[in-house]
Amino acid sequence: MLHFLSSSSPLNPQFLLLPRQSARLRVLLSIPVSAMSSSSSSSSRGALAAAAVPSLSADEAGAAADEAFLRYTSPSMRRSGGGGVAIVWFRNDLRVLDNEAVVRAWAASDAVLPVYCVDPRISAGSTHYFGFPKTGALRAQFLIECLEDLKRNLTKQGLDLLIRHGKPEDILPSIAKAVTAHTVYAHKETCSEELLVEHLVRKGLEQVVIPQGGASNQKKPRNPKLQLIWGATLYHVDDLPFSVNNLPDVYTQFRKAVESKSSVRNCSKLPPSLGPPPGSGLDEIGGWGTVPTLESLGLSMTKAEKGMHFVGGESAALGRVHEYFWKKDQLKVYKETRNGMLGPDYSTKFSPWLASGSLSPRYICEEVKRYEKQRIANDSTYWVLFELIWRDYFRFISAKYGNSIFHLGGPRNVESKWSQDQALFESWRDGRTGYPLIDANMKELLATGFMSNRGRQIVCSFLVRDMGIDWRMGAEWFETCLLDYDPASNYGNWTYGAGVGNDPREDRYFSIPKQAKTYDPDGEYVAYWLPELRSIAKERRNFPGASYIKQVVPLKFDGGHQKRDQQFNRQRRPGHMYRRQK
């Protein structure tokens, strides 16, 4: 994910021609998870209610956001005198705080026009290989909330958000012409579909002619320019101690190099006001437009009765940082709790806002440093930064290897035989594998759009190691469901887990019995998502035998966990054996 796009790399065909949707899958994504569970409503009584993340009220989150904005506002900032109109094209950077594209546009203009394009290839498109919906209802709703909050925060800063439904390469040139914009500012993306859109926008802007004031022999007409800015990572690409092409393939080597030889740039400051918007041209293009609804996107959703409900938007993101770091004081124990699976506070839960760009990784870093000065610095405070560096690593790896992170063989072009058995995959997708730890995690994903880091590793290992299913099916299903989906992290992690990425231990295997005993010893997590297990003794909830549905495959035997896996497999009902299709 950077400016390296191989001409031989295949692009998703929907970016050339929008494909037909899978009606069955889109209906599936509109069904509340409770309707997909075999348990009765009476068996779920007593379950913990859904928890909002953050748990702050809207007023509390807004106050935390206002305080953050105040700390990063500089009354001394002045425009550089560039004049004219600049457009800010919002993409995966749905925030005002530490948004360099916004600040650069403000500084270089007399008026700023923020624009967001609801691209049908994203909102209604299909995944490349298996045709799953590209955006499920849960993430769509989260993004809608992000747009609503972005619009509010821009209004507080003297602007507004112009929203259009359509392809950016069609919309932005027409808007630039209407408001006579000299530049479109946006944050740089790095994967092929996003890079193609950047290319098409640039070509479209080249066809727009903006007349200049004054005598014709003094000022020639010009074309609006596309100015792309790096701003999605903790470490800026220009500050790496190596070129992207020479990026270390092993995370530890990458981390040690950037920690010792690079520094994190400061968050950008804000002026007291980002206004005004353009004074003319908006009527010509139909006004500001409206934030989409699920219905307008052809989606529907029933509010989940349990699990976590993430609130979209920059204000909620800043509220969550305040809540987790300062109000609940959880940062100091993050490393000890991060492998949990149940509840909102075992980890930061920042990832959905990072993925949408509602939260800046540099802001998190500066808050960690502030916490270390005011409260405590320990392994836990460092570990939050450690995880942000992982996020950087996958983005830079995708920049280095381009589309290979989406290919079956991954960056290392590993040749392996994989099954694409649809029935077997659907048992994994729907949480019907017969292994409670797998099924509980998959039901959480369906209900909330979220899954713990530990859970993701376990269900990935099960799909690719125990089931032998094509890892891309899992990656594309995660693309559909995850609130925190971004291509670099999602596909980077899946290639890593499938043994086709940059993991030195390419045969990495997560034993379900070992994981269950270590991370859910009392079966609280599986009983929460699988209410039929609540009546079983705690020590047997992850190993329920005939009390639970039949296991669809035996576990892979590996030397380290063979005895445990044999014990687990003996609970299978006799006479059932899965044979992988050739």
Swiss-Prot record:
GO terms for cellular component: chloroplast; mitochondrion. Residues 560-582 are annotated as: Disordered. Keywords: Chloroplast, Chromophore, DNA-binding, FAD, Flavoprotein, Mitochondrion, Plastid, Transit peptide. InterPro entries: Cry_DASH, Crypto/Photolyase_FAD-like_sf, Crypto/Photolyase_N_sf, Cryptochr/Photolyase_FAD-bd, Cryptochrome/DNA_photolyase_1, DNA_photolyase_N, Rossmann-like_a/b/a_fold. Residues 84-234 form the Photolyase/cryptochrome alpha/beta domain. Residues 570-582 have a biased composition (Basic residues). Belongs to the DNA photolyase class-1 family. This is Cryptochrome DASH, chloroplastic/mitochondrial. The lineage of its organism: Eukaryota, Viridiplantae, Streptophyta, Embryophyta, Tracheophyta. The gene is CRYD.
